[in-house]
Amino acid sequence: MANYTAADIKALRERTGAGMMDVKKALDEANGDAEKAIEIIRIKGLKGATKREGRSTAEGLVAAKVAGGVGVMIEVNCETDFVAKADKFIQLADKVLAVAVESGAADIETLLATEVDGKPLSEVVVEEGAILGEKVVVRRISRLEGGTVDAYLHKTSKDLPAQVGVLFAVDGEGEAAATAAHDVAVHIAAMAPNYLTREDVPADLVESERRIAEETAKAEGKPEAAMTKIVEGRVTGFYKGEVLVDQAFAKDAKKSVAQVLEEAGVKGTAFARFRVGS
């Protein structure tokens, strides 16, 4: 006769995130000892971890937090959207974010090497992934500080955690700075710029766009006298698509992002945008 109850099974499932049959088998093997059963579940899960190494991790979530004027954002990946919305996975991401905030880590290597309860965070992630039955990867981290930093998370599906996250920093403080930082962070989530200013765009990319614009204009039979103006116009169009401050502001297309920031008396200093799997 089993020396555990349905309540024990439920409690262990909540603690581990494992399936009902896996929990029952572990409790049977552990003779009803919950702590031993957890160890069994972990061991069995870790045995399968090597088989999961080559699997794709295209699902997951983005988590972010601003504390003490410092913004931190992470992307944590898993294999399926089923696990991405599981409480256990979300709790793991929250744990990783907390470690990222507290440790001051600014890169993945440093973050994963940070000790949590006597072991590297990387081991904690593997163990939790084993319980979930999927490969789990902490893919990237961003850390911004100085002035005012806003963190914005966007859900692309009501059934999933945030799939898009943004950190945006401006060089001022106060209510106007905070409002502008937030509004532009929301804009970044929607419009996905790749660069903060024109100076940040690699020169070879600009030259490539210029050559393409010129060749296209020639192929279209544009007059030579107007070529310079046409090419510069198309390069400007490229900037308006790729450069944050040149983009038309999402909330009011009559203004550029640069104008919105100028009206608030601030300048953007840095941004990061994560989208799960991209």
Swiss-Prot record:
Keywords: Cytoplasm, Elongation factor, Protein biosynthesis. It holds the Pfam family EF_TS. This is Elongation factor Ts. The lineage of its organism: Bacteria, Bacillati, Actinomycetota, Actinomycetes, Micrococcales. Belongs to the EF-Ts family. GO terms for cellular component: cytoplasm. Residues 80-83 are annotated as: Involved in Mg(2+) ion dislocation from EF-Tu. It comes from Arthrobacter sp. (strain FB24). Associates with the EF-Tu.GDP complex and induces the exchange of GDP to GTP. It remains bound to the aminoacyl-tRNA.EF-Tu.GTP complex up to the GTP hydrolysis stage on the ribosome.
